[in-house]
Amino acid sequence: MAFRKSNVYLSLVNSYIIDSPQPSSINYWWNMGSLLGLCLVIQIVTGIFMAMHYSSNIELAFSSVEHIMRDVHNGYILRYLHANGASFFFMVMFMHMAKGLYYGSYRSPRVTLWNVGVIIFILTIATAFLGYCCVYGQMSHWGNMNIASNMFNMMKTIYMMMLMLLIYIFYTIMMRQMMKTKEYTMLIKSMDYINKNKYMINLNMTNKKDMNNNIGPLNMNILSIIYGSMLGDGHAEKRKGGKGTRIVFQQEYCNINYLYYLHSLLANLGYCNTNLPLIKTRLGKKGKIRQYLKFNTWTYDSFNMIYSEWYIKNMSGKGNIKVIPKSLDNYLTPLALAIWIMDDGCKLGKGLKFTTNCFSYKDVQYLTYLLHNKYNIKSTITKGNKENTQFVIYVWKESMPILTKIVSPYIIPSMKYKLGNYL
């Protein structure tokens, strides 16, 4: 192993600068974060040096500012850097927030990260406001005594008004609406539905494992692709020594266009090499030679949590059993649903079917519950064989228009036949 990777300190530099796995779809908007760090360093350094010469005494404040401008070596540069650096700080911060809004960084699984950013933004505003309260800094003594106090009083007033508004909305309007006949009927129906499905809901709520804090370099796109494929023929491989996990994708030769599409998605996100998967052969049933394609992602430590979610120990023998993770409701996005259809779906009459070979009946029940609860897609379950090792999910033809509308933006041309005449 190279010294830059084995050394404790150099490995940090290596992982962030040299071998940093960045997706190829990244653009210049991602420079805003580092520019914010640069602005912060400038503000801290210039602020510390100016604080060495500034006096907050009302009789000395103005003189100390003039002292910084005239007597301190390059003091005027420090003052102008600090004043204009604050303006650039907020300009870059607003651009950083605009980038996050444009790319949907506030959505799951980045909700917590966005909330922390909002808190940092509010603290930055408060810190900058304290700078304006410095005597004879950027504000006169009169402004300091009057405007500052008025600002704080206004904040208290806004807080009380928002609190009263929230109380009015949540306790008045919603309670009135609840008593209307239509909403009341919907509530009774919802309670009846929950009563009938309380086992599945309880299983979901009690066993759900939150993965949002363990994602690492992942994002919703890569998780949607992986989870959608894992519902079909994809699987996760834990590397020897527990040093990481890779995701393996495999398809028959007849689905070559779909596998190339899947490979291009992952390659563009930077999770696998750009070489096209090669055609391989294997011995099928009755000695028939079958052609297939296969590729895998790089090995990542952050994929370990995906493995732990999808696999449990086999109590009756060696190896692990593939299961449906209880956190799937967070990641069964339209993209994941489209990947599952292209990976494992099959047109049947005016409907669609999914054949599951790895999951138990309870897992398949949970899948149908998610389809109905998340997208209002109705389906039924039947046994695929006598050994109860295979179950088939049939999507009703009444739900096909809904399903088609959800997944159509992600279905490639060679797979549109699976949706029949609805597309």
UniProtKB/Swiss-Prot annotation:
GO terms for biological process: mitochondrial electron transport, ubiquinol to cytochrome c; mRNA processing; RNA splicing. Its main location: mitochondrion. Residues 1-143 are annotated as: Cytochrome b. The keyword Transmembrane applies. The chain crosses the membrane at residues 32-52, 85-105, 116-136, 154-174. Changing V395M: In W404-4; abolishes maturase and endonuclease activity. Residues 1-31, 106-115, 175-423 are mitochondrial matrix. It is a multi-pass membrane protein. Residues 144-423 are annotated as: Maturase. This protein is responsible for splicing and maturation of cytochrome b mRNA. Specifically, it may be responsible for the splicing specificity of the second intron. In the N-terminal section; belongs to the cytochrome b family. This is Cytochrome b mRNA maturase bI2. The lineage of its organism: Eukaryota, Fungi, Dikarya, Ascomycota, Saccharomycotina. The gene is BI2.
